[in-house]
């Protein structure tokens, strides 16, 4: 019998991780409900019921959950991958934005098919991820500072480029809007992601495409890279101790850069699949897109586990879709606050992991003393 099998169930890292995430979600939901009671006591039960039931109320709503979960999953994978290698990729939003721009550039300006546009999104995100990696590896500049700066640089650069590329905007394709990109169903239907084999199951919902399949494949691929390859071992070794990794002959500078490049590519794919769905257009923004930041609680809730990221992103997407059904009993601002509270508390998985571990260790110590 292996050591893993001899280990008590509640002391296994995987079990503790799952329990920590579930406990965090429960605490977040409870505090969210308390907040609803404080704001509008009479509608609190109905509001929470709407939040928890809407996602399964119809196949169209479930399709929307999957649609929103796909880019969220990619951003969660991006942040989690960097976490695993000892880096904090707070620049996922900028990489997401550049991925969206590169993919739309290929779709609208160059009239390329969806799979090329998707690859372009990965390239755009990777390019925007390489800068924080280089500054960290060769100048020891904190990647958080660099990444935040590049979030804003990326947003304003995309705005500048789009404003000077009339053919990219909706106004260049017969629409009156000049503050957003052209609709793909008009500019290049071939760049829209295929509906996939399950579209009929969802009643041909406009939200359904192959993006959720693509993201699950990437989650599995990232897990394999981190857990089953020498390259993944080297990346994690650099994350645990850069000096020890160098002593062992691992090129830590190269791995830091590669980690941020891969992390950026994952965020870039997230931006690509969101806009290549064909259901929305990129609007010239005045503030940083929130999707990249939403990847942080996804990664924390999943404890940076790529497989856990699948379920964490689905949960957060489900809560967001359900929150929209709480109107008119609650204002949109109130709903955003409640969702933020739930997501923030759900991200306390690491804290809950420590609490569970201490509780189990204390119980084991008492049993040993009794014997």
Model-identified regions with their sequence ranges:
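Transmembrane helix-bundle core of multi-pass membrane transporters
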Residues: 54, 59, 151-226, 367-370
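Helix-loop-helix "hairpin" substructures at the membrane interface of multi-pass membrane proteins
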Residues: 127, 188, 194, 202-281, ...
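Single transmembrane alpha-helix segments in multi-pass membrane proteins
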Residues: 36-40, 53-109, 122, 126-141, ...
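Short loop segments and helix-boundary regions at transmembrane helix junctions
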Residues: 7-19, 83-91, 110, 119-188, ...
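Transmembrane alpha-helical segments in multi-pass inner-membrane proteins
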Residues: 261-267, 271-340
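Hydrophobic core segments of alpha-helical transmembrane domains in multi-pass membrane transport
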Residues: 20-37, 72-79, 100, 104-106, ...
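Cytosolic-side transmembrane-helix boundaries in multi-pass membrane proteins
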Residues: 1-25, 240, 247, 251-254, ...
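Membrane-interfacial amphipathic/re-entrant helices at transmembrane-helix boundaries
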Residues: 2-74
């Amino acid at each position: 019998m292996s050591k893993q099998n001899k280990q008590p169930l509640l002391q296994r890292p995987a079990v503790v991780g799952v329990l920590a995430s579930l406990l965090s979600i429960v605490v977040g939901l409870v505090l969210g409900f308390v907040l609803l009671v404080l704001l509008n006591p009479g509608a609190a039960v109905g509001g929470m019921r709407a939040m928890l039931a809407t996602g399964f109320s119809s196949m169209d709503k479930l399709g929307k959950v999957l649609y929103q979960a796909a880019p969220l999953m990619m951003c969660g994978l991006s942040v989690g991958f960097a976490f695993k290698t000892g880096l904090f990729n707070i620049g996922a939003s900028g990489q997401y934005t550049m991925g969206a721009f590169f993919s739309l550039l290929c779709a609208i300006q160059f009239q390329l098919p969806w799979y090329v546009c998707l690859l372009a999104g990965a390239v755009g995100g990777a390019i925007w991820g390489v800068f924080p990696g280089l500054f960290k590896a060769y100048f020891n500049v904190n990647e958080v500072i660099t990444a935040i700066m590049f979030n804003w640089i990326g947003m304003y650069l995309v705005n500048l480029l789009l404003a000077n590329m009339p053919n990219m905007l909706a106004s260049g394709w017969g629409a009156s809007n000049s503050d957003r990109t052209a609709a793909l169903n008009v500019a290049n239907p071939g760049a829209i992601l295929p509906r996939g084999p399950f579209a009929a199951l969802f009643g041909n919902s406009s939200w359904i495409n192959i993006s959720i399949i693509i993201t699950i494949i990437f989650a599995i691929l990232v897990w394999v890279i981190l857990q089953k390859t020498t390259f993944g071992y080297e990346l994690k070794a650099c994350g645990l101790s850069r000096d020890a990794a160098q002593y062992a002959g691992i090129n830590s500078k190269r791995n830091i850069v590669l980690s941020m490049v891969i992390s950026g590519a994952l965020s870039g794919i997230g931006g690509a699949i969101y806009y290549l769905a064909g259901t929305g257009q990129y609007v010239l923004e005045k503030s940083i897109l929130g999707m990249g930041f939403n990847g942080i609680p996804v990664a924390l809730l999943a404890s940076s586990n790529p497989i856990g990221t699948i379920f964490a992103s689905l949960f957060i997407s489900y809560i967001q879709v359900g929150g929209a059904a709480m109107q008119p009993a609650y204002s949109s601002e109130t709903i955003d606050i409640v969702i933020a509270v739930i997501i923030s508390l759900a991200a306390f998985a690491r804290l809950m992991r420590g609490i569970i571990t201490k509780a189990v260790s204390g119980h084991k110590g008492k049993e040993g003393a009794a014997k």
